[in-house]
Amino acid sequence: MSDVPDDANAGCPGTGSAGAGKASGCAGCPNQGSCATGQGPPPDADVPKIQDRFSRIKHKILILSGKGGVGKSTLTSNLARALASDPSKQVAILDVDICGPSQPRMMGVEDEEVHNSADGWTPVGIQPNLTLMSIAFLLGDKNDAVIWRGARKNGMIKQFLKDVDWGEVDYLLIDTPPGTSDEHISLVQFLLQAGPLDGALIVSTPQEVSLLDVRKEVSFCVKTKVPILGVVENMARFVCPNCAHTTLLFPTSTGGAEQMCKDSNLELLAQLPLEPALAKALDNGEDFFETNPDSTLAKSFLDLAEKVKAKLV
């Protein structure tokens, strides 16, 4: 991916492209002159700070989805808990869904505050080996809308990356907003500048309306050189809690995520069932693995965690 400066216009072709400083989208950009002469913008002074923070994080995983409402944040929170079931591993969640942060509610820490010190922001502790950072902790009222343009969102994401004092972390899961917007471009750019990115998990539901956007997300990863660890199909079926009968909830007119993965040469890591008890646990900020340890879904999350760990060895 050609580099796109943080302060570039929306139509920036990238500093490494043939049209740098000359394309119509470059008009009025503060970097236009330097790009046109081949000099490019000055080095980003924050990159070394991000590199320093992330040098203590072993594995960094993006959680992506093309469409909202497919369960991306649900997957993030429960995969984090599954990974943290090993007390020897330190796990963290970074919630960069700036306009729709839901992790604090799901993790039962909605009323907590972030403390700032000379070492930076201290993420909120969920359990001894699991922490969380979200813009929701910085809002005066949890019902306040975040009405920001792209540049301000990107600035917030950069601040998360350079100012949060994570400490030593084995797995950092990054919960992103749906789509392939400014936030995704800036986030990937910053992360790749900071060092290797392990890859992305892409979340979908079985119906073609969801898969249409998943294919765009796959294209985004290819173009930005983000490795794809695999695809997770959420709400693949409903398992009756009384008789264990399985019912397909959504039509799979094109074969669902399984066929899409075959067509795209991707691995389908899990097909997670829909379980009402999970929605209740998330609304109440409870640990689903404690409230429903024997459920099919809890076991599916634990199996997924093992597959993810195997890919990161």
UniProtKB/Swiss-Prot annotation:
Keyword annotations of the record = 4Fe-4S, ATP-binding, Cell projection, Cilium, Cilium biogenesis/degradation, Cytoplasm, Iron, Iron-sulfur, Metal-binding, Nucleotide-binding
Binding positions ([4Fe-4S] cluster 1): 12, 26, 29, 35
Q: Which gene encodes it?
A: nubp-1
Note on how the cofactor is bound: Binds 4 [4Fe-4S] clusters per heterotetramer. Contains two stable clusters in the N-termini of NUBP1 and two labile, bridging clusters between subunits of the NUBP1-NUBP2 heterotetramer.
- UniProt tissue specificity: Expressed in head amphid and labial ciliated sensory neurons and tail phasmid ciliated chemosensory neurons.
Quaternary structure?
Heterotetramer of 2 NUBP1 and 2 NUBP2 chains.
Q: What is this protein called?
A: Cytosolic Fe-S cluster assembly factor NUBP1 homolog
| Gene source species | Caenorhabditis elegans
Q: Which SMART domains match?
A: AAA
Set out the biological process GO terms recorded for this chain's protein: cell projection organization; iron-sulfur cluster assembly; regulation of non-motile cilium assembly
Family per similarity comment: Belongs to the Mrp/NBP35 ATP-binding proteins family. NUBP1/NBP35 subfamily.
Q: What is its main location?
A: cytoplasm
Q: Where does ATP bind?
A: 66-73
Localization, per the record, is: Cytoplasm; Cell projection
Summarizing the function annotation, the protein's role is: Component of the cytosolic iron-sulfur (Fe/S) protein assembly (CIA) machinery. Required for maturation of extramitochondrial Fe-S proteins. The NUBP1-NUBP2 heterotetramer forms a Fe-S scaffold complex, mediating the de novo assembly of an Fe-S cluster and its transfer to target apoproteins. Regulates cilium formation and structure.
Annotated binding of [4Fe-4S] cluster 2, by residue: 240, 243
InterPro entries for this protein: AAA+_ATPase, Mrp-like_CS, Mrp/NBP35_ATP-bd, NUBP1/Nbp35, P-loop_NTPase, YlxH/NBP35
Q: Where is this region: Disordered?
A: 1-25
Give the Pfam families listed for this entry. Answer: ParA
Q: Report, from the record, the phenotype seen after gene disruption.
A: RNAi-mediated knockdown results in abnormal cilia morphology with the formation of 'wing-shaped' cilia structures and additional dendritic ciliated endings in amphid wing B (AWB) olfactory amphid neurons.
Q: Which GO terms describe its molecular function?
A: 4 iron, 4 sulfur cluster binding; ATP binding; ATP hydrolysis activity; ATP-dependent FeS chaperone activity; iron-sulfur cluster binding; metal ion binding
Cytoplasm recorded as keyword: yes
Q: Which cofactor does it need?
A: [4Fe-4S] cluster
